[in-house]
């Protein structure tokens, strides 16, 4: 029986699905544009990749505090419009002949900043529009949309870049307009949940809540470890493909699209796996396997590079979907609604704050190693080191399921004695 998640969630889900396809276009086009149109070095690719996450350490600490005080729906609508303007500025600058790496850095950083506020509202939006007993199914659909966008996005992006060049980014700008229209059509929700307390006190509360809870603490440590190595792999991948392996844009786009089928399957399978094994156990093993399968990229160029990239990233995405579907319900189950905004913001600040440094480290390391090893071997070494570092995230995650089981036993016991 198919669960109904309600009109408000359907609007939210629809807007996000369209916008996510546009996001994948930008994620694909920006490094491609840099490498082929701006002749960027791996270091410059790493710098702009860093900008994608720069808003996290700069704005993350206060985003949750402020969003708790604001109307979430209106906040997310405004964020969509800001991102629309920033993305549209890139092709305009290119046509005017003034697009440079620093300007691209600024535009991407603006998108990053708006996305920080949007994502805090995003995590509050789902429980605000969906009943508690349907949260996992709602997140599964959202994760399915994310992974469907990864299937369609790269091939669409490759075709659009071939036909339009920098103008392909205007498609992403248009998707933000669609998302904003969906928010406008929704009934009012997401009013301010906190009206008292200073920004500093609320911020401190968010970090305390994440660290004081034993489950949240393990999730934080696992996520920090994952994000210390994973972005190295992701940042260096287009450098490996284009400059190291000589993969063409169309072939790379096709490989990424074909690979993302695995991520779609992960989003569909995660609720069933989580129900059978437990969310915590599923998350832990998904973390380990997500990282280890990344080593498969080392099979190129011995095997055809597009095939290797497609299969590797497909498995990579399958397990990432499992992680995402399991992580959010685990965290939300440990926190009351009035503190979820600040808790999520503190979580993102702590766990995503390392991503800019990891992305910069990946690009810098390839640049430093290339003179001695060549770009192919330099990229392979850096990606392998980043992947193995991320695999250590499995260790703290192993203890999550026993804590969840204990909490459930206590809940049942308290309910039976009430």
Question: What function would you assign to each model-found segment?
Answer:
Residues 1-418:
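Alpha-helical transmembrane-bundle signature of multi-pass membrane transport and export proteins
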